[in-house]
């Protein structure tokens, strides 16, 4: 592969997109959401990122790695899985978006249907935003739009997965949020001129090199949706000084 910081040409991008199906297109659009907001197609998003010079070869490699398209990494970039892993964490992609894609790929259709029902119970307005064909990443975006999920607060999704008995996925989200809170506190502790605060919903995500981190299961989390409105409102900790 040539320079990893090189911005690929538009013809190269078009040929690459021809190799992807509609599901993979939706995942790429989700991965690009923070850096290319407002784009409704993956082509628009990639063109926007190319104009911003954020769409480097390393970013494309990381996207394809998240999609598990090792065949394209080999044929288009001449990279093995191990070679691609050397470039992870060097692009604009956030751990939050990558983790959501990983979680969604582990869910079957019945679990996704249940998650959509849980979401509509939490916020009835989501019934108009979601359909039977809505993918997991589209569910995540809908939850973001109503303030139930953000890069710094994924406890609502974790509770939903706990109800489905998908403790493996639930614990990945719990571990992620704990790490984000610890990172936020560390950044403020290292900056005496800034007030120390607990992490609040809506703050931006930070980048990590890991994709989906294995974690240990925990049994100390509350059950989901006994009182969904109250539980979702308690996810945002009080500001401290």
Curated annotation (Swiss-Prot):
SMART domains reported in the protein's UniProt record: DED
Sorted UniProt keywords: Apoptosis, Host cytoplasm, Host nucleus, Host-virus interaction, Inhibition of host apoptosis by viral FLIP-like protein, Inhibition of host autophagy by virus, Modulation of host cell apoptosis by virus, Repeat
Chain intervals for the UniProt region annotation (Disordered): 212-241
Residues covered by the DED domain: 8-78, 95-175
Cellular-component GO terms for this entry: host cell cytoplasm; host cell nucleus
Stored PROSITE patterns: DED
Biased composition (Polar residues): 229-241
Protein's cellular compartments: Host cytoplasm; Host nucleus
InterPro entries assigned to the protein according to its UniProt record, in alphabetical order: DEATH-like_dom_sf, DED_dom
Main location: host cell
A Gene Ontology BP annotation from the UniProt entry: symbiont-mediated suppression of host apoptosis
Subunit description: Associates with the death-inducing signaling complex (DISC) formed by TNFRSF6/FAS, FADD and CASP8. Interacts with FADD. Interacts with host TRAF2. Interacts with host NEMO/IKBKG (via N-terminus). Interacts with host SH3BP4; this interaction plays an important in the suppression of host autophagy.
Role: Inhibits TNFRSF1A, TNFRSF6/FAS and TNFRSF12 induced apoptosis. Directs the degradation of host NFKBIB but not NFKBIA. Also suppresses host NF-kappa-B activation by interacting with and preventing ubiquitination of host NEMO/IKBKG, the NF-kappa-B essential modulator subunit of the IKK complex. Interferes with host CASP8/caspase-8 recruitment and activation at the death-inducing signaling complex (DISC). May lead to higher virus production and contribute to virus persistence and oncogenicity. Also participates in the inhibition of host autophagy by interacting with host SH3BP4.
Protein name per its UniProtKB record: Viral CASP8 and FADD-like apoptosis regulator
Species: Molluscum contagiosum virus subtype 1
């Amino acid at each position: 592969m040539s320079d990893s910081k090189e911005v690929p040409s538009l013809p190269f991008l078009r040929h690459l997109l021809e190799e992807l199906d509609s599901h993979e297109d939706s995942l790429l659009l989700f991965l690009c959401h923070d850096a290319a907001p407002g784009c409704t197609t993956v082509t628009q998003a990639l063109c926007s990122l190319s104009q911003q010079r954020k769409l480097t070869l390393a970013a494309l490699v990381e996207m394809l790695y998240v999609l598990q398209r090792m065949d394209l990494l080999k044929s288009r970039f001449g990279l093995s899985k191990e070679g691609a892993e050397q470039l992870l964490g060097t692009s604009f992609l956030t751990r939050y978006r990558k983790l959501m894609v990983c979680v969604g790929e582990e869910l079957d259709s019945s679990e996704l249907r249940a998650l959509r029902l849980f979401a509509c119970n939490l916020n009835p307005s989501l019934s108009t935003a979601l359909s039977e064909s809505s993918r997991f990443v589209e569910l995540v975006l809908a939850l973001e739009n109503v303030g139930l999920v953000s890069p710094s607060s994924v406890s609502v999704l974790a509770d939903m997965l706990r109800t489905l008995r998908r403790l493996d996925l639930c614990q990945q989200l719990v571990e992620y949020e704990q790490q984000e809170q610890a990172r936020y506190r560390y950044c403020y502790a290292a900056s005496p001129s800034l007030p120390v605060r607990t992490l609040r919903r809506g703050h931006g995500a930070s980048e990590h090199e890991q994709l989906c981190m294995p974690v240990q299961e925990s049994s100390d989390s509350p059950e989901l949706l006994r009182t969904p409105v109250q539980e979702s409102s308690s996810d945002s900790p009080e500001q401290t000084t």
